[in-house]
Amino acid sequence: HNGSGRFYMSRIDKCKIIDLPKIHDPRGNLTFIEGTKHIPFDIKRVYFLYDVPGGAERGGHAHKDLHQIIIAIAGSFDVVINDGSDTQRFHLNRSYFGLYVCPMIWRELDNFSSGSVCLVLASDYFSEADYIRDFPQFDSLQKS
């Protein structure tokens, strides 16, 4: 969003897997994330999805301004991202890999394994006004 009411078109190639720091220890491994150091934004909100029923899908929206990191803390799931032109599917199954999703990217999460936990780090507090929940509306914004 550029402040003038027009949105910058986001490209799918800005979204990427970030290899998070790992400390290997025989007592158990540790991964940590520091905002603006390991990821390209400050963390203002953290939430997680769990007990997702088999066959269920999450997501199905885009954000106008929000940046996110999506991590499979336990188990696995797929994230399908779409910029209005291209689609890419990421299979997340390692707790030290985070998928960076920039603003104006449609995302859908599916293929959740039993017991999976999805952790999301967000660049801002919740705001319903930041959501685009209608794909045709998203598509027309991307093409305008």
Predicted regions, residues:
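Short coil/turn motifs at secondary-structure junctions
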Residues: 108, 125-126
